[in-house]
Amino acid sequence: MELKASEFGVVLSVDALKLSRQSPLGVGIGGGGGGGGGGSCGGQGGGCGGCSNGCSGGNGGSGGSGSHI
C-alpha cells in the first residue's frame, strides 16, 4: 500500500509538470512543483496561496499541495 501511495505521488508531480507546460492554468496549480516554471508562477501568484513560496524555494513538495488545490 505504501509503495503504491509513493508511486501515485510521483505520477501526480509529473502530471502537474506536464499540465503546467501545456496550459497557463496548470502553472498556477502545480507551479511549485516545477522550479523552471517559477517565473511564470510569479505572474499568477495570486491564484495560489503557496505558489509564491514554491517559486522562491523551488521545492517539489510544494507542488503536491498546489496540485491538490
From Swiss-Prot:
There is a cross-link at residues 47-48, 50-51, 54-55 (Thiazole-4-carboxylic acid (Gly-Cys)). Signal peptide: none annotated. Keywords: Antibiotic, Antimicrobial, Bacteriocin, DNA replication inhibitor, Plasmid, Thioether bond. The keyword Lipid biosynthesis does not apply. There is a cross-link at residues 39-40, 61-62, 64-65 (Oxazole-4-carboxylic acid (Gly-Ser)). There is a cross-link at residues 55-56 (Oxazole-4-carboxylic acid (Cys-Ser)). There is a cross-link at residues 40-41 (Thiazole-4-carboxylic acid (Ser-Cys)). The keyword Glycosyltransferase does not apply. One of its GO terms (biological process) is negative regulation of DNA replication. The processed N-terminus does not resemble a typical secretion signal sequence. Maturation of thiazole and oxazole containing antibiotics involves the enzymatic condensation of a Cys, Ser or Thr with the alpha-carbonyl of the preceding amino acid to form a thioether or ether bond, then dehydration to form a double bond with the alpha-amino nitrogen. Thiazoline or oxazoline rings are dehydrogenated to form thiazole or oxazole rings. Residues 1-26 form a propeptide. This glycine-rich peptide antibiotic inhibits DNA replication in many enteric bacteria, that leads to induction of the SOS repair system, massive DNA degradation and cell death. B17 inhibits type II topoisomerase by trapping an enzyme - DNA cleavable complex. NCBIfam families: microcin_B17. This is Bacteriocin microcin B17.
